[in-house]
From Swiss-Prot:
NDH-1 is composed of 14 different subunits. Subunits NuoB, C, D, E, F, and G constitute the peripheral sector of the complex. It comes from Maricaulis maris (strain MCS10) (Caulobacter maris). It catalyses: a quinone + NADH + 5 H(+)(in) = a quinol + NAD(+) + 4 H(+)(out). InterPro entries: NADH_DH_suC (IPR010218), NADH_quin_OxRdtase_su_C/D-like (IPR037232), NADH_UbQ_OxRdtase_30kDa_su (IPR001268), NADH_UbQ_OxRdtase_CS (IPR020396). GO terms for cellular component: plasma membrane. It comes from the Bacteria. Belongs to the complex I 30 kDa subunit family. Pfam families: Complex1_30kDa. Keywords: Cell inner membrane, Cell membrane, Membrane, NAD, Quinone, Translocase, Transport, Ubiquinone. NCBIfam families: NuoC_fam, PRK06074.1-1, PRK06074.1-5. It is an enzyme of class 7 (translocase). This is NADH-quinone oxidoreductase subunit C. One of its GO terms (molecular function) is NADH:ubiquinone reductase (non-electrogenic) activity.
Length: 200
């Protein structure tokens, strides 16, 4: 299988040399990295080329690397049922530069792109309906970014008296938790189950 993926990787890199910035095979999977502005051209070619025939877009997902100048990777997972291959196509972008939509190539990309926008704030140029998909209408921020606080910015709940949804500052009540902050190196006064060494 890896020999077939190697041949496929070379074929893609040679045919799309202006767009491909690199490719690799790891854990039996081919990953092709491309320039952001060439995504629609490359995916159209991957779909239509007789040696590829990647007719199914399985998923689009985002990855956040805050330390990079182009902090986001957009990852396209493709399937060729004809060739029995799966590949991953990646591109990098930042918070400002829009990624061209691939809805003309794969109509199923519509909701995948909306999810990436909603979770990461990745903007897809020429998307027909780029609005939030999974979060609330007035949601602030992008929850899958690494710099988003784990608790969020506000707490949302239904107020029975007002008969509406209300937004309040986050309040973490943890009275039920009993934290034992003693370091195990300072010597515990009790023996943990299964710790036979502590008895001797």
């Amino acid at each position: 299988m890896s020999e077939a993926l190697k041949v496929l990787g070379e074929h893609i890199a040679n045919a799309q040399d202006a767009a491909v910035t690199g490719w690799s095979i790891a854990n039996g999977e081919l990953t092709v990295e491309i320039h952001r502005d060439r995504i629609e051209t490359v995916l159209t070619w991957l779909r239509d080329d007789p040696a590829c025939r990647f007719t199914t877009l399985i998923d689009i997902c985002g990855v956040d690397y805050p330390q990079r100048a182009e902090r986001f990777e957009v990852v396209y997972h493709l399937l060729s049922m004809h060739q029995n291959h799966r590949i991953r196509v990646k591109l990098s972008t930042d918070e400002e530069a829009p990624v061209p939509t691939v809805i003309p190539v794969y109509p199923v990309a519509d909701w995948f792109e909306r999810e990436a926008f909603d979770m990461y704030g990745i903007v897809f140029a020429d998307h027909p309906d780029l609005r939030r998909l999974l979060t609330d209408y007035g949601f602030e921020g992008y929850p899958l970014r690494k710099d988003f606080p784990l608790t969020g910015y506000v707490e949302v709940r239904w107020d029975e008296e007002e008969k509406r949804v209300v937004y309040e500052p986050v309040e973490l009540v943890q009275e039920y938790r009993d934290f034992d902050f003693m370091s195990p190196w300072e010597g515990a006064k009790y023996i943990l189950p299964g710790d036979e060494k502590a008895e001797g």
